From Swiss-Prot:
<keyword id="KW-0963">Cytoplasm</keyword>
<comment type="function">
    <text>Member of a network of 50S ribosomal subunit biogenesis factors (ObgE, RluD, RsfS and DarP) which assembles along the 30S-50S interface, preventing incorrect 23S rRNA structures from forming. Promotes peptidyl transferase center (PTC) maturation. Binds pre-50S ribosomal subunits near the 23S rRNA L1 stalk, where it may mediate correct positioning of the L1 stalk.</text>
</comment>
<dbReference type="GO" id="GO:1902626">
    <property type="term" value="P:assembly of large subunit precursor of preribosome"/>
</dbReference>
<keyword id="KW-0699">rRNA-binding</keyword>
<dbReference type="GO" id="GO:0019843">
    <property type="term" value="F:rRNA binding"/>
</dbReference>
<keyword id="KW-0690">Ribosome biogenesis</keyword>
<protein>
    <recommendedName>
        <fullName>Dual-action ribosomal maturation protein DarP</fullName>
    </recommendedName>
</protein>
<dbReference type="GO" id="GO:0005829">
    <property type="term" value="C:cytosol"/>
</dbReference>
<keyword id="KW-0694">RNA-binding</keyword>
<comment type="subunit">
    <text>Interacts with RluD in late stage pre-50S ribosomal subunits. Interacts with ribosomal protein uL16 (rlpP), via the N-terminal loop of this protein.</text>
</comment>
<dbReference type="InterPro" id="IPR023153">
    <property type="entry name" value="DarP_sf"/>
</dbReference>
<dbReference type="Pfam" id="PF04751">
    <property type="entry name" value="DarP"/>
</dbReference>
<feature type="region of interest" description="Not required for functional ribosome assembly">
    <location>
        <begin position="111"/>
        <end position="183"/>
    </location>
</feature>
<dbReference type="GO" id="GO:0043023">
    <property type="term" value="F:ribosomal large subunit binding"/>
</dbReference>
<comment type="similarity">
    <text>Belongs to the DarP family.</text>
</comment>
<dbReference type="InterPro" id="IPR006839">
    <property type="entry name" value="DarP"/>
</dbReference>
């Protein structure tokens, strides 16, 4: 018996099974390129980190070696190494790496915000005196009122005499120590 032309489609394997879970997801070539470029940028961010920060990111041995090599290479070789790191990242789960990197960035941002607050508090201490000292004592009850008054008095004298702000820096250092001892 010979098959009719319309029957030849019946022999396609898997054609008779219609499973909705096996739906093919089509991804455009542009989207694949964007993802690859984004992973290259992630790799470049990791390469730019210092050794201490790099230790806090979960990396396997191959990826770690590639990153350390990229840190030593300059110019065109570095670009090629970053492409390799991007390729290696495509084959791995990058979510833990992203989370660790975000955590490092967030810690740095929190420290910058704290320094700005301490600088503003220092400036208020120099400008307002006892009112600002009361605020500092509310924030840190173990702060030394006498030491603060001495530093403020010296900072005002330096400011009036157009001298370098040595005491203002000491006030900032003291406030930073208080903030670090609290946390």
């Amino acid at each position: 018996m010979t098959k009719q032309p319309e029957d030849w489609l019946d022999d396609v394997p898997g054609d008779d099974i219609e499973d909705e879970d096996d739906e093919i997801i089509w991804v455009s070539k542009s989207e694949i390129k964007r993802d690859a470029e984004e992973l290259k940028r992630l790799g470049a961010e990791i390469v730019d980190l210092g050794k201490n920060a790099l230790d806090k990111i979960p990396l396997d041995a191959d990826l770690r070696a590639a990153i350390e090599l990229a840190q030593r290479i300059k110019m065109e070789g570095r670009r090629r190494q970053l492409q390799l790191i991007g390729k290696m990242l495509r084959q791995r789960d990058v979510e833990p790496i992203r989370q660790a990197l975000d955590k490092l960035k967030n810690r740095h941002n929190q420290q910058v915000v704290l320094f700005h607050k301490l600088e503003n508090l220092r400036d208020r201490l120099i400008d307002q005196g006892d009112d600002a000292i009361a605020e500092v004592l509310n924030l840190w009850p173990d702060a030394d009122r006498q030491q603060l008054r001495t530093l403020i008095r010296n900072a005002k004298k330096e400011k009036e005499g157009n001298k370098p702000p040595k005491s203002a820096r000491q006030i900032f250092q003291y406030l930073r120590e208080l903030a670090e001892n609290e946390g």
